[in-house]
């Protein structure tokens, strides 16, 4: 997210605590917060999808649900054509 938008979120938050927000500012704050949260969720999802779990013997123990997502995206050499990947 653009640093200017994050600064605006913080500015509106501070103003809300001190003098309060106008109706327009409340709408702007809600929109900016939703945009920030969506970006955060996208980032976490991308990070989790890139994880491959391996046990002490080196065996892939990644949960099947995560493996399926990785197959769909072609991550970690996984492929929809190879159900064992």
UniProtKB/Swiss-Prot annotation:
Start-end of Basic and acidic residues biased regions: 62-85
Database matches in InterPro entries: DUF896
Keywords assigned: Cytoplasm
Disulphide bridges, residue numbers: none
Gene Ontology cellular-component annotations: cytoplasm
Primary location recorded for the protein, binned into one broad class: cytoplasm
Signal peptide per UniProt: none
Highest taxon of source: Bacteria
Record localization: Cytoplasm
Chain spans, region Disordered: 58-85
Sequence similarity: Belongs to the UPF0291 family.
Protein name, as recorded: UPF0291 protein SAG0271
Organism: Streptococcus agalactiae serotype V (strain ATCC BAA-611 / 2603 V/R)
């Amino acid at each position: 997210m653009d640093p200017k938008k994050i600064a605006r979120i913080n500015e509106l938050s501070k103003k809300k605590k001190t003098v309060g927000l106008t109706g327009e500012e409340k709408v702007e704050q809600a929109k900016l917060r939703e945009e920030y949260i969506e970006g955060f969720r996208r980032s976490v999802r991308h990070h989790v999808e890139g994880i491959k779990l391996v046990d002490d013997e080196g065996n892939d123990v990644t949960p099947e649900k995560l493996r399926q997502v990785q197959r769909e995206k072609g991550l970690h050499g996984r492929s929809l054509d190879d159900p064992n990947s």
